[in-house]
Amino acid sequence: AKKIGLVGVQIGSNVNQLNLGEPQFLEFFATCESLGIAVFVHPWEMMGEKDIQKYWLPWLVGMPAETSRAICSLIFSGVLEKCKDLRIC
């Protein structure tokens, strides 16, 4: 991304149902940190999505909950402690 002039990358709020704080993703976040590349976390595969189809609930409840799940995973797993200069948006 950096080589072609991009300033950030996007990742889903989970990868194949794995939280972003899982150890196999640490190298990705450390690399983004060292290159100064921002990471945009986009809600993906919302938990409980099939049960909340009415009233725009997937967008009003599901996406914020999924984003919170991803960020909490990064915080509580220690990724943000290990990658202190990582920019998440």
Question: What are these language model-derived features?
Answer:
Residues 2-89:
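Catalytic pocket-lining loop regions of alpha/beta-barrel enzymes
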